Regions:
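Divalent cation-coordinating acidic motifs and surrounding scaffolds
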Residues: 1-69, 74, 78-103
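Terminal, contiguous helix-loop blocks that mediate binding/assembly
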Residues: 76, 83-183
Length: 183
């Protein structure tokens, strides 16, 4: 809730199904999911696919500012073929995206922030590779919980007229500080 009139566009690529584009919209306090498009089967871990989807969204939903949340598995700077192909970002089936490919898939200077809901993406190697992609990068240097970031609490902060990234970080920290599951 509290999207402040903004557009929350979701590229969703569930395992075993073709990707789809969704819009999450709030009307009179009610959150609605609107199906925008089905894509043909494509490799979502391909930088050309990423760039194409971002370009499509930006052209269809012009805005004064953009943020990007990337959710997947992440293993920072280690190459994608290291130890069972588990060292990169963005899994689609058996395909993984190297960090330099991720940088190729993201346009320069478009995003106010990139938030990684993925493990290990706050390394200096990752942030350096993505240095021209966003003003701010929010990420964890270690594992993140499978439940992901507390989006219900963070959405008002991400969609505020005055972007509240410090509060997003505090919300993330406090959420996991106060949540003992699964330990």
């Amino acid at each position: 809730k509290n999207l402040n009139g903004g557009n929350l566009i979701v590229y969703y690529a569930p395992a075993g199904s073709p990707p789809e584009l969704l819009r999450i919209k709030e009307e009179n306090g009610v959150v609605k999911k609107i199906h925008l498009k089905d894509y043909e089967k494509q490799n979502s871990a391909d930088p050309d696919v990423m760039r194409s989807v971002i370009s499509e969204v930006v052209s269809q939903y012009p805005a004064g500012s953009y943020g990007l949340v990337l959710w997947s598995h992440g293993t920072a700077w280690l190459p994608s073929d290291y130890q069972n192909k588990l060292k990169a970002f963005g899994q689609d089936g058996n395909n993984w995206m190297e960090i330099d490919d991720l940088a190729k898939g993201l346009p320069d200077d478009l995003f106010d922030f990139i938030l990684f809901d993925a493990c290990y993406m706050a390394s200096v190697e990752c942030t350096y590779e993505l240095r021209n992609k966003a003003e701010y990068i929010l990420a964890s240097p270690t594992e993140t919980m499978a439940d992901g970031w507390p989006y219900e609490e963070m959405m008002p902060q991400l969609f505020a007229t005055d972007l509240q990234l410090e509060k997003v970080g505090e919300t993330f920290y406090n959420h996991f500080l106060n949540n003992t599951y699964p330990y």
